[in-house]
């Protein structure tokens, strides 16, 4: 209900990403090797621009992402609405091929989750994120672009 949750127009995106990376890395570090997944894929979905982080700065998050990619083979996927997702992802060290713009509505969000579901089905089979992972998201976004 509106009493429990309400939109405030704030996105602490860098804090969310930084905390997630640290928590997942800590879990991996405290696990026996056989319990650490062969692939780690971090999916970032936002409907707004960073404007509220207090703990993490852009350069810190970028360094964290680059370290996990280089040292541990993590993959990062970024989906953003109401922003230039390709540019924002790039500023964090996420390649344009792993970033997509989407419409923040029912169809756009559903399209995201279908694409992510297919992506994880492939990753679970031992594959990397496919180059065409965002094909349907791009098709939807471009067909309804204003």
Model-derived regions: residue spans:
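Acidic, low-complexity intrinsically disordered regions
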Residues: 1-146
């Amino acid at each position: 209900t509106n009493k429990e949750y309400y939109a405030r127009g704030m996105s602490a995106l860098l804090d969310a990403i930084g905390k997630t990376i640290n928590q997942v890395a800590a879990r991996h570090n405290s696990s026996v090797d056989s319990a650490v997944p062969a692939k780690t894929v971090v999916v970032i979905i936002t409907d707004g621009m960073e404007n509220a982080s207090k703990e993490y700065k852009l350069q810190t998050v970028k360094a964290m992402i680059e370290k996990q990619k280089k040292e541990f083979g993590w993959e990062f996927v970024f989906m953003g609405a109401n922003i230039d997702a390709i540019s924002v992802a790039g500023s964090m060290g996420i390649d344009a091929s792993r970033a997509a713009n989407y419409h923040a509505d029912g169809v756009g969000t559903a399209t995201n989750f279908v694409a992510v579901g297919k992506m994880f089905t492939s990753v679970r089979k031992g594959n990397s994120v496919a180059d065409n992972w965002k094909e349907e998201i791009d098709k939807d976004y471009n067909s309804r672009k204003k």
